[in-house]
Regions:
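S-adenosylmethionine
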Residues: 268-273, 289-367
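Glycine-centered, small-residue-biased loops immediately flanking beta-strands
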Residues: 238, 261, 331
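Conserved class I S-adenosyl-L-methionine
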Residues: 237-246
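Class I SAM-dependent methyltransferase SAM-binding "motif I" and its flanking Rossmann-like core
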Residues: 8, 72-136, 296, 306, ...
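Conserved SAM-binding loop of SAM-dependent methyltransferases across substrates and taxa
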Residues: 247-259
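Conserved SAM-binding loop
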Residues: 276-277
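Class I S-adenosyl-L-methionine
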Residues: 1-99, 103, 126, 260-263, ...
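A contiguous loop/helix-start segment that scaffolds small-molecule binding in enzyme catalytic cores
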Residues: 1-4, 14-16, 64-67, 135-218, ...
């Protein structure tokens, strides 16, 4: 059993944690944390191994001894405790939390947990912040290093939220604690508190404007995209395959639905695949996994999906059956077609497997002559939606 004890910036340990640290035969942690704890005779002190994947070897080396690790604040708030549990398992790790930097930041700002959100950029692409931006939101940003405030300021400016107040809360809980506004000095250890202001794109609803996506015309349009996503039904923890992804709009909106969703966009054209990556970053979901290749071959080795969207290439031999077979029980498949050949395929699939078959026809008002307007129909889309039975 590895016990992880939280420690604050000034070296404070929770009472239970202090006793555990004092009795530990082996103490692990970052060099800064180890330096904050008084020496204990006979105690072995080791910094975290690099890479962290070597940790099991360190634990085996000290098997049979009492091992305690130090971590910042609450180890399970975007901390190493989460990494250790994923690596070693829940039964192998015990956690004794201290006050987290998030709790201290909320206290300094006077923000309740209910009216503020936490975004971690530790070891992550700063573009992940974009999804969270909306006028009036209060965001606590866990920074990766001293360069994070500049990256955040650049994103705010580019995304239309240049009026956001950026508070830099440094060395929280220590005698050297600071509270400044950016631009200004940035301590190595800090949390950003953002009071978001501006007029940038700020919707979590499905059906973002088509012009939100860089595209070459291969794009699932706004109205039919919203219909598809309502049937794909994104939920936390669910994985989507977006097959024939085009501009990646369906996968991107799936990811924007919740931070714990995941998605793989499969696109045969390399230029479009690169474009998908740019769209994902600009719309706040850089975690999108883009696979360049032609389905169904490109699907080999992908993790099992909870939902599949086939927006292009449905006529590829065996593709729909491959997607149906890959789905987890209860998984959802949505396929679109605009050609007679694809429509025929989807009608056959409907008759063979059931589900829901819908023809989506949308018209928009456009100028007609010099003085009038009229309805212009978009190309109709046939949509087949199917759910895999739990007992299959």
């Amino acid at each position: 059993m590895l016990t992880v004890v939280g420690i604050t910036a000034d070296g404070h340990l929770p009472p239970a944690g202090r006793a555990l640290v004092g009795r530990a035969e082996v103490l692990l942690g970052g060099e800064r944390h180890l330096a904050l704890v008084p020496a204990v005779p006979g105690q072995v002190r080791r910094p975290w191994p690099r890479p962290m994947a070597a940790l099991p070897d360190v634990l085996r080396e000290h098997a049979g001894r009492t091992i305690v690790a130090l971590a910042s604040g609450d180890p399970l708030v975007s901390g190493i405790g989460t990494t250790l549990i994923r690596m070693l398992g829940t039964d192998a790790v015990a956690v004794v939390p201290a006050v987290s930097s998030v709790a201290l930041a909320r206290a300094r700002m006077g923000w309740s947990a209910e009216e503020s959100a936490v975004v971690t950029l530790v070891g992550r692409d700063a573009d992940a912040l974009r999804r969270e931006l909306a006028p009036g939101r209060r965001l606590l940003v866990l920074s990766s290093d001293e360069t994070t405030p500049a990256a955040v300021a650049a994103i705010l400016d580019e995304a239309g939220f240049a009026g956001t107040a950026i508070h830099v809360l440094g060395d929280l809980g220590s005698d050297d604690e600071t509270h400044t506004r950016y631009p200004g000095p940035v301590p190595r250890l800090h949390v950003l508190a953002l009071e978001v202001a501006g007029t940038g794109l700020a919707s979590w609803a499905t059906g973002l404007p088509d012009d939100a996506f860089e595209n070459d015309g291969q794009l699932t349009k706004r109205d039919v995209r919203a219909s598809a996503l309502s049937r794909l039904a994104p939920v936390p923890g669910a994985l989507l395959w977006d097959v024939g992804a085009g501009a990646g709009s369906v996968a991107i909106e799936w990811l924007r639905a919740h931070p714990l969703t995941s998605a793989v966009a499969v696109e045969a054209d390399p230029e479009r695949a690169a474009r998908i990556g740019r769209n994902a970053a600009r719309l706040g979901v850089p975690r999108l996994d883009v696979v360049t290749g032609r389905a169904p071959d490109a699907l080999t080795g992908l993790p099992r999906p909870d939902a599949v969207f086939v927006g292009g290439g449905a006529t590829a031999p065996g593709l729909l059956d491959r997607c149906r077979d890959a789905l987890a029980p209860g998984g959802r498949l949505v396929a679109h077609g605009v050609t007679l050949e694809t429509e025929r395929l989807l009608v056959d699939a409907f008759h063979a497997h059931g589900g829901e078959l819908t023809r989506l026809a949308v018209e928009h008002v456009t100028p007609l002559g010099g003085r009038f307007t009229g309805w212009t129909p978009a190309r109709a889309v046939v949509q087949w939606a199917w759910t895999k039975e739990h007992l299959q």
